[in-house]
Amino acid sequence: MKFFALFIYRPVATILLSVAITLCGILGFRMLPVAPLPQVDFPVIMVSASLPGASPETMASSVATPLERSLGRIAGVSEMTSSSSLGSTRIILQFDFDRDINGAARDVQAAINAAQSLLPSGMPSRPTYRKANPSDAPIMILTLTSDTYSQGELYDFASTQLAPTISQIDGVGDVDVGGSSLPAVRVGLNPQALFNQGVSLDDVRTAISNANVRKPQGALEDGTHRWQIQTNDELKTAAEYQPLIIHYNNGGAVRLGDVATVTDSVQDVRNAGMTNAKPAILLMIRKLPEANIIQTVDSIRARLPELQSTIPAAIDLQIAQDRSPTIRASLEEVEQTLIISVALVILVVFLFLRSGRATIIPAVAVPVSLIGTFAAMYLCGFSLNNLSLMALTIATGFVVDDAIVVLENIARHLEAGMKPLQAALQGTREVGFTVLSMSLSLVAVFLPLLLMGGLPGRLLREFAVTLSVAIGISLLVSLTLTPMMCGWMLKASKPREQKRLRGFGRMLVALQQGYGKSLKWVLNHTRLVGAVLLGTIALNIWLYISIPKTFFPEQDTGVLMGGIQADQSISFQAMRGKLQDFMKIIRDDPAVDNVTGFTGGSRVNSGMMFITLKPRGERSETAQQIIDRLRKKLAKEPGANLFLMAVQDIRVGGRQANASYQYTLLSDDLAALREWEPKIRKKLATLPELADVNSDQEDNGAEMNLIYDRDTMARLGIDVQAANSLLNNAFGQRQISTIYQPMNQYKVVMEVDPRYTQDISALEKMFVINNEGKAIPLSYFAKWQPANAPLSVNHQGLSAASTISFNLPTGKSLSDASAAIDRAMTQLGVPSTVRGSFAGTAQVFQETMNSQVILIIAAIATVYIVLGILYESYVHPLTILSTLPSAGVGALLALELFNAPFSLIALIGIMLLIGIVKKNAIMMVDFALEAQRHGNLTPQEAIFQACLLRFRPIMMTTLAALFGALPLVLSGGDGSELRQPLGITIVGGLVMSQLLTLYTTPVVYLFFDRLRLRFSRKPKQAVTE
């Protein structure tokens, strides 16, 4: 009592305390960063290595495997995957959540250094690493276009001037420049001219390499002067290389221009980028795992004017894609929802209390509690994101509950004629323990969430802490500010005020009277109610088992990402045509705003596209509906497939896949993997629960297999190294020299001119100069035959791996898909040498599924323990917890009704319901126990009186929580797919629990009371327990 009196009789101190809480919250709000979701990115590091011309199998065995063995020893690596393709290897290291990325980067560098001696000596550079996840969608894409400059020159500007500057911006993890390659001098050899002049490809390579050198020449010096020696030892342009003498034939000079076409071109001609049908260079910017996307994008935008000033006016620099507008729009929608929820909750209070003065009290208490929470969020390092703002929206109903319970009880004493200050003190004393019980037991629900590990635990932690802090501040405000305001602001109702909203008052009285009559009947038919309660428990189990489940609601972020997978033997020219065709189909869709894409590099038969949709207000379809519409049009394109998926704020794993979910096959037997992967993929493609089934295993690339006759080679004076060098010189885009410029270094690239490599007969024109100086055709000592070869070799850990990716058709859930895949694997009878498991997001979903029931049970157990401690009873907590089955049934039925799967967001709703619906029972049980202890009433009389007496606050708190969640259900616009499942779960659970618990709780209370009396050794003390 002294605690309450301290604040009631010291209004100035109480007001200043509330002002201090509010001011701290305002300061915290201004400093909070903005993000789509809590920081849940795994620390990921990508290691890249290249060996131009090497086959995927060579890259896997000679580059990937040594690196994997060294990198696999690093502490904290949760997953290591690699992909080796023509001339390149990429290894993705995913670390545990608690691993510091900078420390991990140092360990990665040390591991690369340790493996260096095991790597091939011909690698042009050491392996490098980046602190970014290549599977993440870029947070921003910049494009460079020009009608004047070539693609190589644009790429040079992008990679030399723009990319390094952008990489230095806080939060930027990686800037990937695509669409072309650096400028280079290309030497296209004419094999017939070489043969006629008796010049080998090695002769050309050696001559060029020796003619372009950069070595120190020293200096001359006398007694008074010093002269630096400078020579014209470097050749920089094609015009300078063309007259280079490479050989003498019968005394005549053979110049490079006589046997080759020399051009100023690019390092790799098999690269193409486009934006809206126009050739472009793309700068794909990805953030660091721990970076804030909004802050990073804002920092990049702030630097754009400076960047534009560094490039010529004839180059157009544009933002082709920006992830931040939809994130900002989504957060604005949540903020509007929060404001609406506060307004609706205050309206509920006004309708019930029918007093403007009384309504002002919760209208002050709610903002103080919510605003004060921002200070704690800032101190905890949280952000303003969809989940934390949804927590505050839901908290609106919770924080007003405490104020309502105190306010309603004080108002009841005022209506009985008690003086305001006395009513405030007496009313607060009566319900102080009730409010404490409700708040502590509600916070207890979230304790298991705080202890939950992995991605779900990290994702839900901000939600749980934010809500718990809001409840804690609300508890403080409801026991300090609320009774003080009641004591000093409220007064006995006047007749004129009692007439306000008389219709609603009469309706409430009628409801209470009707409830009293129905409750009498129920208390005389307790077995029927008990059967209903048991039925709801059984129905809960059945609904939970049968309801479709997924990990996280499918978001509409306004951005689509597409992966092109073409025939494995397709040429680059044909692949570029496919990219253009797909981009035209996409660009013609009315919901599409911008399209960028690129193809080429080490995987000629693949490409990527990034599609920006129009804002939600300018289109009627969701991202998934647009994908479904485009899928039908894209299927008509022969020889290639474009797989589209909506970019999500949460993506797990480092695999670059063409669909949202992955299933990985592992085996130590590569032959078994290659045998079973096509069978499994074809089977999964027939399942109606899956869409866009594709695989990263590509074993049917066209290959020309050359078989050396070693005996003939020995007789002719030719070794294998010379023969392999011939092939690399002719067909490997071999980088044979370096041109040094002030801003960058460029390569001289040699190959047989593409005009002479249009078919297999090109091999017949190749020759080697033997040790006697004679030109020996390749056909003299080698035979060739067409064969199939892999376009890529993939590993997970140290095992061969193949990843099957898939999307979900409309109306299907991830639980449907995972169950269908498990059935298919069983039906196929896959041998034990081939192991299958879900990867990425699908893997996290499986882990979350296994822990959901345990999490719910842990929350219930925690609440039971807290209530048991508070009530010093084993029985009363069970009475209070008997309200939960009806809430569960209501929530699951509502999800089924709205065709929404059970996701992590719905799980949050279930956890919240555990805290919400027990409040009704707490209010009933508290007053019933008080009536038994001090009113000398029988248990049935006590619980009956408690139900009637608490009917109004129960209705008020339930309607406040319901109206607080209702805007989430009705909200549209950006981010609504996250908000609606939470609102649906809470509203459905509240409606059902309100209908049932008003009757089941009294029955359970009496049941446990009789049970306790039956087993008690001291029946006389049963009432005083």
From Swiss-Prot:
Residues in compartment: Cytoplasmic: 1-6, 354-359, 412-430, 491-852, 918-947, 1008-1025
Pfam families given in the database record: ACR_tran
Periplasmic topology ranges: 30-335, 380-388, 454-467, 876-894, 971-984
Compartmental location: Cell inner membrane
A GO CC annotation given for this chain: plasma membrane
InterPro entries membership: AcrB_DN_DC_subdom (IPR027463), Acrflvin-R (IPR001036), Multidrug-R_MdtC (IPR023931)
Segments traversing the membrane: 7-29, 336-353, 360-379, 389-411, 431-453, 468-490, 853-875, 895-917, 948-970, 985-1007
SUPFAM superfamilies recorded: Multidrug efflux transporter AcrB pore domain, PN1, PN2, PC1 and PC2 subdomains, Multidrug efflux transporter AcrB TolC docking domain, DN and DC subdomains, Multidrug efflux transporter AcrB transmembrane domain
Major location category of this protein: membrane
Protein's membrane topology: Multi-pass membrane protein
Molecular function, one GO term: xenobiotic transmembrane transporter activity
Family indicated by similarity: Belongs to the resistance-nodulation-cell division (RND) (TC 2.A.6) family. MdtC subfamily.
Quaternary assembly: Part of a tripartite efflux system composed of MdtA, MdtB and MdtC. MdtC forms a heteromultimer with MdtB.
Protein name: Multidrug resistance protein MdtC
Organism annotation: Escherichia coli O6:H1 (strain CFT073 / ATCC 700928 / UPEC)
The encoding gene: mdtC
